[in-house]
Structure formats: C-alpha cells, structure tokens
Amino acid sequence: FDYVIPLAGLVGAPLCEKRKKDAIEINLNAVKDLVSMLSKKQRIIFTNSNSGYGIGSKQKFCDENSPLNPISLYGRTKVDAEKIVMKFKNSISFRLATVFGYSYRMRTDLLLNNLVLLSLRDKKLDIFESNFRRNFVHVSDVCDGIIYAIYNFSKLKSNVYNLGMSKANITKFEMVKKIKKYIKKL
C-alpha cells in the first residue's frame, strides 16, 4: 500500500477509562506496531484528536503550536501515538475537532448528539458551563481533508494540522440556540 490511514480506535474519555488496557493496546500499541512495519516509501496519514490540548486556554483557540496537555487517558494515548507517527519521515497528522454527522451507530456521549437526544426526550435542557466552547468538523470534511493530504502529501508531510471548522467553534449556549430552531418545544 502507498498510504496507510489508521482509523481504528477506542474513542472518547469515558470508554477509554472504562477499558484502559484496550485503549492503550488499540490507540497506542497498535499504532506503534503499524509504524514499525511501514517501508520507507509508504506514507501514513494519522488522525489524532484535539483532546490532546486538554483544557487549552480560555483566551485563545488552540492551534498546532499550542502545548499538548491531555487530561484523559484517551487524549494521552492519541498524543503518544502521534509522537510515534511523526518520527516517521513520510507522515501527516490531523488533530480532529469533534466529528459529527450521520452514523449507523450514533454516539450519544458526544456533546451535540447528547444535547439533541436530551432535548427530544426531556423537552428541556439544563446547561452546565454554558460558555464552554467546542470545535466541530463534519465527517465528510474529514474525508475531504484526508483526500487532500493524499494529493498534496509532499507539500504537507512531516507536519501536524488541526482539522475543524472555524464557524463551528461555538459555546454550549450557542449550540442549544441552534438546536432550538429545529426542536420547537424546547
């Protein structure tokens, strides 16, 4: 294979805390093993998470030069795996914002999906830390980013890129207002 794009993993802090050994084995050790098997000509495009930034800074958005300070096992395994990948000469890493979009197996633990579920079920929402910001990216934009990386690999290689939508860097309160447009009885 010319390109290796590892997408398997245990995703999210709650699941990784519940299945610690599996999280380390799948999110970190499997990536380490995969990188060790690559030929010098092969190229790897890795998908990390913006969870590696931890809580970040309240004054500014995190960029690729922001310090990595993961606060969960999930974030730590992804950061450590990225370090391994980026030691490989032919590598690119995307630090993904929270991915959203239709799935056959919807994750109701994700903030956006959880807010929609609660609003449909309970017809009301109690918002904790309403000014907390999250950045989002649609799954089709992630796919477009990976395709772009394949076609522009030599220009992008050996670098890390945040992949998210500027317009989707919103507070919980702003998110609830958007949900309210579609769920009238909220």
Language-model regions, residue ranges each:
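Conserved Rossmann-fold NAD(P)-dependent oxidoreductase catalytic core, especially the SDR/UDP-sugar
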Residues: P6, K32-L73
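C-terminal substrate-binding subdomain of Rossmann-fold SDR/epimerase-dehydratase oxidoreductases
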Residues: S119-K123, I127-L186
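NAD(P)H-binding glycine-rich loop region in Rossmannoid oxidoreductase-like domains
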Residues: F1-E25
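Short-chain dehydrogenase/reductase
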Residues: D22-I24, K60, S66, I71-V79, ...
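Conserved beta-loop-beta element that borders a ligand/cofactor-binding pocket
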Residues: N48-S49, E82-S103
